[in-house]
């Protein structure tokens, strides 16, 4: 069964296995909903249940999943609280797993997810989260999800982890996508640390 919201400002649609209509309260209880397409995202309701109220207002979808970029399938968020407003408008928050080259999982919380031309999300990564790209690189700042980009983009400071106790552990400023399976950080003559000091690239060796 296909359900349509005919109001032009809403105009979403989705398929349900069955639905119940409460005409006294103007409520539709839809069941067996696999996904709802909003913009370039596919939103999966928990247990396939969706509640539609007067004026096609959809109840928030708790513990839903969001496939950001349903064509390329680059990103998926889970345990989301999602508000579907129309066929091209939603906002949400949810969780995303960063899986490194050793298949270790670190979970990021995206407090902002929405669609404008593409699905976009933002997650804060504070220093106390102790987030690592890998065993060699620690990071704090923020992550951005763009559904058209294969990898998350990171804005903040990277610390190179090493055992040299005579070298200060400063954080280098980055603004780039990072492939978690193949960490390559961009360093050039304009690269600075988090205190806006120029980063010097060098090789240090020891006989120890």
Where do the model's predicted regions map?
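Structural signature for solvent-exposed beta-strand/loop edge elements and short helix-capping sites
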Residues: 1-208
């Amino acid at each position: 069964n296909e359900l349509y919201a005919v109001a032009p400002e809403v105009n979403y649609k989705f398929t349900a296995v069955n639905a119940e209509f409460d005409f006294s309260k103007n409520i539709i209880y839809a069941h067996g909903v696999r996904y709802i397409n909003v913009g370039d995202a596919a939103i999966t309701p928990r247990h396939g249940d969706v509640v539609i109220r007067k004026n096609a207002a959809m109840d928030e979808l708790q513990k839903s999943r969001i496939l950001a970029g349903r064509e390329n399938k680059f990103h998926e968020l889970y345990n989301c609280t999602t508000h579907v407003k129309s066929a091209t408008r939603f906002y949400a928050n949810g969780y995303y797993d960063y899986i490194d080259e050793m298949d270790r999982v670190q979970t990021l919380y995206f407090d902002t997810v929405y669609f404008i031309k593409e699905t976009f999300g933002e997650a804060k990564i504070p220093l106390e989260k102790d987030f690592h790209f890998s065993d060699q690189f620690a990071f704090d700042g923020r992550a951005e999800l763009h559904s058209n980009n294969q990898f998350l983009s990171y804005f903040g400071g990277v610390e190179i982890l090493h055992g040299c106790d005579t070298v200060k552990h400063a954080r280098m400023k980055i603004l780039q996508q990072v492939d978690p399976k193949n960490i390559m950080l961009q360093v050039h003559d304009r690269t600075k640390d988090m205190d806006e000091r120029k980063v010097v690239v060098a090789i240090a060796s020891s006989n120890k």
